Structures are given as C-alpha cells and as structure tokens.
Amino acid sequence: MAITKERKNEIIAEYRTHESDTGSPEVQVAVLTAEINALNTHLRTHKKDFHSERGLLKMVGRRRHLLKYLRETDVQRYRELINRLGLRR
C-alpha cells in the first residue's frame, strides 16, 4: 500500500527544485501521486477496504488543493508538473 522510503527519496530527488527541497508543492504532489497510485492498485484487489478508500479520498483532496495553489501562484510550474506526472489536466 504505502510507498517505500527508497522510492519516496527517488521521487523527492526527481522533483525537487533545489538540493535540500522536500516540501515544495511539486515534491508534495509527486509523492501524493505515487501514494495514490499504490493505493489504487491495492483497492483493485481489496474492493471492500473502505478505510483505505477513505484515506485515498483524503490524499486526492490534498493533492487537488496543492495543485490549485500551484496553479494560482505559478501557472508555468503547474503545467510542467502536470505534464511530468501525466495527470489528466
């Protein structure tokens, strides 16, 4: 279900804006996207895991708010992130 620490560090290294960046919106959205994808695969096999489904919905909401913030502050960074992650927007 959850992504491993090594995978999370790889994602942070790929999407960070500077050397010590771990909290920029790009990094947060990328980590949330990886967690959402992992949880989606879990929920495909465990259809009645409603507790995890609620966690998934909370993650999607958190990602939506971060994307909205990024879109309002810097549209260029928002578009680049959407393209890199392959999100539908």
Swiss-Prot record:
GO BP field: translation
> Keywords for this entry?
Ribonucleoprotein, Ribosomal protein, RNA-binding, rRNA-binding
Q: Name one GO cellular component term.
A: cytosolic small ribosomal subunit
Query: Could you tell me which PROSITE patterns the record lists for this protein?
Result: RIBOSOMAL_S15
List the GO molecular function terms.
rRNA binding; structural constituent of ribosome
Task: Kindly list any coiled-coil regions of this protein.
Answer: none
Top-rank taxon of the source lineage equals Bacteria
Query: Is RNA-binding a UniProt keyword of this protein?
Result: yes
Name the Pfam families for this protein. Answer: Ribosomal_S15 (PF00312)
Question: What interactions and quaternary structure are annotated?
Answer: Part of the 30S ribosomal subunit. Forms a bridge to the 50S subunit in the 70S ribosome, contacting the 23S rRNA.
**Main role?**
One of the primary rRNA binding proteins, it binds directly to 16S rRNA where it helps nucleate assembly of the platform of the 30S subunit by binding and bridging several RNA helices of the 16S rRNA. Forms an intersubunit bridge (bridge B4) with the 23S rRNA of the 50S subunit in the ribosome.
| Family from the record | Belongs to the universal ribosomal protein uS15 family.
By what name is this protein known? Small ribosomal subunit protein uS15
**Species annotation:** Lysinibacillus sphaericus (strain C3-41)
Name of the encoding gene: rpsO
